[in-house]
Amino acid sequence: DKAEMTELLWKITGAMVRYLVPWDKAVFLISPKGNNGKGTLCELLRSLLGKGNYANIPITNFGKDFMLEPLTHVNAILTDENDVGTYVDSVGNLKAIITGDQIQLNRKYKPPITFRFRGFMLQCLNDYPNYRDKSDSLNRRQLCVPMTKCFTGEERRYIKADYVHRKEVLQYVLFKVLNMDYDQLPEPESCKCELDKSKEMNDPVLQFMAEVMDVLVWDLVPYTFLYDLYK
């Protein structure tokens, strides 16, 4: 689905600048390898948005006091790096922010306020976070995008350092995405597969079934037998 993925990346770019549209999704760019283009895409998006219009908030910070105050004056969340092996204990604010629901925002040395974030979020990941929340309410808010390319040995460093900052390049990108007619982000098959991997990572029962289903000889097995294997 190369063409679908190309279209998706264009539409993600458009979602960043059309931040008042209720996308109800956050984008998670996933790749365990480096040199895959995540950082370059983020650099392009930062150039499009302009300095001061985005915040860098890792996933683990959404459940911490005072970490969300920058959202009061930005239109986007762009995070290049999240720690590998991240355990996310609280996702209430994360889910609410993705879908534009109200949150209580605690501010340092100031009274808390009720706040609704109207922007768009993109997070870069090297592996799947381990969430305490296993519910589908979190899963349906995630658009997991596998970044399968690897440019090691053929890097074009000038693209990130210079090209994506050129005025004519930014004008072209902005013109293209603002003339695309859509109000939902598509979900290619490879993105659905990536979300399934994230679900499996966060559900020990799914992990177990993925391991044993292909090696079971019988089509029907006693549940007590499966439970003994699971233990």
Model region roles, listed by residue range:
Residues 1-231:
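Feature primarily recognizes SF3-like P-loop helicase cores of small DNA viruses
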